[in-house]
């Protein structure tokens, strides 16, 4: 479902893969895949613009480490070729009541005493009744992403024809395994 205030360009190829589904959950073993499917069912997910929820985790895809945020794009106006590096990384997020976060000593990121090393993946949100725990969507045992590789891709698009010229995985499985 698309919001009328956040439309996609209709004539330019989209970077990224289609929405996640339970059947697309992946693992390096059948147990991994099963545990990822269970985590998927336990979370709230309605596509790319899934809003945060209070009572259960939600899946953010692409996540904070996903999309074309690592290095952005390169464009050659002479030949109209755009090269984009993008990551395929979903996140598994959970809101935490601010009272609980305060009780555990979790500080907001704008506090001078905040330390990412101390807080890890959880941070209280300034002026909010919540903290948020942000994690990659990993399989519980192996800590491998629950979506199928590749986790990094480079895409070349001819902006004159609005067609993908080529698309290749970027990186190796060596650095993504347990």
Regions found by a protein language model. Name each.
Residues 1-178:
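Noncatalytic, solvent-exposed loop/strand surfaces
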